[in-house]
UniProtKB/Swiss-Prot annotation:
Highest taxon of the lineage: Bacteria
Keyword Ligase set for record: no
Family matches, as NCBIfam families: PRK05022.1 (NF003451)
Pfam families named among the record's database cross-references: GAF, Sigma54_activat
4-aspartylphosphate: residues bearing it: 56
Function of the molecule: Required for the expression of anaerobic nitric oxide (NO) reductase, acts as a transcriptional activator for at least the norVW operon. Activation also requires sigma-54.
Sorted UniProt keywords: ATP-binding, DNA-binding, Nucleotide-binding, Phosphoprotein, Transcription, Transcription regulation
Source organism of the structure: Aeromonas hydrophila subsp. hydrophila (strain ATCC 7966 / DSM 30187 / BCRC 13018 / CCUG 14551 / JCM 1027 / KCTC 2358 / NCIMB 9240 / NCTC 8049)
Protein name: Anaerobic nitric oxide reductase transcription regulator NorR
Binding site for ATP: 214-221, 277-286
GO biological process terms, semicolon-separated: phosphorelay signal transduction system
Gene that produces this protein: norR
C-alpha cells in the first residue's frame, strides 16, 4: 500500500532538483525505494523508440541503448497499452533488461511493470519497474501505480516543455528533421557534450559558416548533420565531400563541375558539389587537405557566391552554407603557408571544438551501450551484454582513435564473443578487447600492419570472420575512415566491401 504522504514527498522532492537530469534521478530513486523494486528506468519516447533518460539498479550502458518498438515487443506493448501493463514471469515477450542488472547478469527479470506516460493523450515516455521476485509487485494496485505514473509524466512533460521553449528561437521551420532510430546520433551526458550541444543550438539557425575542429574519429560529420538539421536549410540537401580523398586531377571538377568536352573523359555535363548543395549546405570534410590553387577558387565562391564549371565561361550563382571540418591545426598551417589566411578567416566565423573521447570518459558506458544495441541488431542477436570488468577496461583506455575506435572495438568483440560462446545472447568480456597496441597511425601501411592476435578455440569460419573484421578495421583506420580508399587498398570491389562489412557487423 502506497501512502499519500509518500507520493507527496516524491512530488516535493522533485521540486528540489537543480536540473532535469537531477529531477529524473530523484524520481526513479524514489520509485525504487517506494515500490521496493530492483531496477527502474525513465524513458522518453521519440521517433518510434524509447530513449533512457535516467536509470536506477541497471548497468550504466543502458543509458546509451535505444529501444526501438519494432525490435522490442515488450516496449511496444507498453507503448500501445494506454494503461498499467504487468508482465508475468513466463511472458513470451523478452525483457530488454535481461542480463543488464548488476550482480544479476545471469538471471532474467521475473517481475515487470510498464507505465506509459502521456501528455494530452500523446505518448511522451514510459516508466519501467522491474524485480527479481515474480510476486514482487502483486501487493501494489494498478491505481497506486497510475499515481506514480502521473508524477513521472508531469516531471517528464515539464522538462520537454522547457526544452521546446529553450529551443524555440532556433528550431527549424521544417518538420520531421530529427534523427530517426536508424540514424547515428550524438551520445553523451558529460559537460563537454552539453557544451557542444549548446554551441550547435546557438549557431545552427544562423547563416554563419562553421569550422568543426577535432581529432580523427570524434564525430565531426555528426556535428555537421546536427547543425544542418537545426537550420532553416534543413529541407534542402546536405552534400558531403571528403577533401582528403580527392585526387588533384578531379578535385576542381568535384567542387565546381564541368561541361562536356572540357577535358578527356568529360563525355557529358556534370554538376559539382556546390551546385548540388544550392540552397542547402556543403560539408567539406578534411578541408586542410585542399591544395592552395583550389583554396583560392573556393575563396572566390565564398566571397561572391558564383562559380564556373570547368570549360564554361558562364558564371553560375549558388547559395550555399559551408560547414568545414579538419583534424589539423589550421592556424599553424596558415603560419607555414599551407593554408590561406583569408580562407581560414572566412571559414572559422564560428569554430566548434569536437571533444576527444578522453575529454569525456564518463560517456564511455553510454556509447558502449549504444554500440552494443546497434551491433545486436546488425548481427541478429537476442541480447548483447558487456561485463562490468570489460566496461571498466574501456573506461581506462585512452582511445586515440576516439569514438570510431570504440565502435570498431565493440563490433569486433561482439563477433568474437558470438563465435566463442555460440549463443544468441553473448557477453563481451575483457579478453574480447585487445587495446594494448592502439589504432594504426594514418601513415602506417595497411599491408604491413601487425594483426591483432585472435583468441584460441575458434572454428575456421569464426576465425576467418574475426581476421577479416580486424583487417578491414585497421585498413579503414589507416585511410581515415574512407571506404573507397579502403576498398582499393584491400583490392576489393567497393560494393563487395560494404556487403562484407555489413555481414561482419561493422556497418549497420
Amino acid at each position: 500500500m502506497i501512502s499519500t504522504d509518500s507520493l507527496a514527498r516524491i512530488a516535493l522532492d522533485l521540486q528540489l532538483g537543480i536540473s532535469h537530469q537531477d529531477r529524473f534521478h530523484r524520481l526513479i530513486q524514489s520509485v525504487r525505494s517506494l515500490l521496493n523494486s530492483d531496477a527502474s528506468a525513465l524513458l522518453r519516447y521519440e521517433g518510434g523508440q524509447f530513449i533512457p533518460l535516467a536509470i536506477d539498479g541497471l548497468m550504466q550502458d543502458v543509458l546509451g541503448r535505444r529501444f526501438a518498438l519494432k525490435d522490442h515487443p515488450r516496449m511496444e506493448a507498453i507503448a500501445r497499452a494506454g494503461d498499467v501493463v504487468r508482465f508475468p514471469a513466463d511472458s513470451s515477450l523478452p525483457d530488454p533488461y535481461d542480463g543488464l542488472l548488476p550482480d544479476h547478469d545471469d538471471f532474467k527479470v521475473h517481475a515487470c511493470v510498464g507505465l506509459p506516460l502521456f501528455s494530452d493523450q500523446a505518448l511522451i515516455g514510459a516508466l519501467t519497474i522491474d524485480g527479481m521476485n515474480p510476486t514482487q509487485f502483486d501487493a501494489i494496485s494498478d491505481e497506486e501505480l497510475r499515481l506514480v505514473g502521473a508524477l513521472a509524466a508531469a516531471a517528464l512533460n515539464n522538462a520537454l516543455l522547457l526544452e521546446r521553449l529553450a529551443r524555440q528561437s532556433s528550431e527549424p521551420l521544417v518538420p520531421g528533421t530529427r534523427p530517426g532510430p536508424e540514424q547515428p546520433e550524438m551520445i553523451g551526458q558529460s559537460p563537454a557534450m552539453a557544451r557542444l550541444r549548446h554551441e550547435i543550438e546557438v549557431v545552427a539557425n544562423s547563416e554563419l559558416n562553421v569550422l568543426i575542429l577535432g581529432e580523427t574519429g570524434v564525430g565531426k560529420e555528426l556535428i555537421a548533420k546536427a547543425v544542418h538539421r537545426g537550420s532553416q536549410r534543413a529541407k534542402a540537401p546536405l552534400v558531403y565531400l571528403n577533401c582528403a580523398a580527392l585526387p588533384e586531377s578531379v578535385a576542381e571538377s568535384e567542387l565546381f563541375g564541368h561541361v562536356k568536352g572540357a577535358f578527356t573523359g568529360a563525355i557529358h555535363n556534370r554538376a559539382g558539389k556546390f551546385e548540388l548543395a544550392d540552397q542547402g549546405t556543403l560539408f567539406l570534410d578534411e578541408i586542410g587537405e585542399l591544395s592552395l590553387p583550389l583554396q583560392a577558387k573556393l575563396l572566390r565562391v565564398l566571397q561572391y557566391g558564383d562559380l564556373q564549371r570547368i570549360g564554361d565561361d558562364t558564371p553560375l550563382k549558388v547559395n550555399v552554407r559551408i560547414l568545414a571540418a579538419t583534424n589539423r591545426d589550421l592556424k599553424q598551417a596558415v603560419v607555414e603557408g599551407q593554408f590561406r589566411a583569408d580562407l581560414y578567416h572566412r571559414l572559422s566565423v564560428f569554430p566548434i571544438h569536437a571533444p576527444a573521447l578522453r575529454e569525456r570518459p564518463g560517456d564511455i558506458p553510454l556509447l558502449a551501450g549504444y554500440f552494443c544495441e546497434r551491433c545486436r541488431l546488425s548481427l541478429g542477436l537476442e541480447q548483447l551484454r558487456i561485463q562490468p570488468q570489460a566496461l571498466q577496461l574501456l573506461e581506462r583506455h585512452d582511445w586515440p582513435g576516439n569514438v570510431r575506435e570504440l565502435e570498431h572495438a565493440i563490433h569486433r568483440a561482439a563477433v568474437l564473443a558470438r563465435a566463442e560462446q555460440g549463443s544468441q545472447t553473448p557477453t563481451l568480456a575483457s579478453h574480447h578487447f585487445n587495446l594494448a597496441a592502439g589504432p594504426l597511425p594514418p601513415s602506417t601501411s595497411p599491408a604491413m600492419a601487425p594483426m591483432t592476435p585472435l583468441p584460441g578455440g575458434l572454428g575456421l569460419r569464426a576465425a576467418t570472420d574475426a581476421f577479416q573484421l580486424a583487417l578491414i578495421e585497421q585498413t579503414l583506420a589507416a585511410h581515415n575512415g574512407n571506404w573507397a580508399a579502403t576498398a582499393r587498398a584491400l583490392e576489393l570491389d567497393s560494393g563487395n566491401l560494404h556487403r562484407l562489412a555489413k555481414r561482419l557487423g561493422l556497418k549497420a
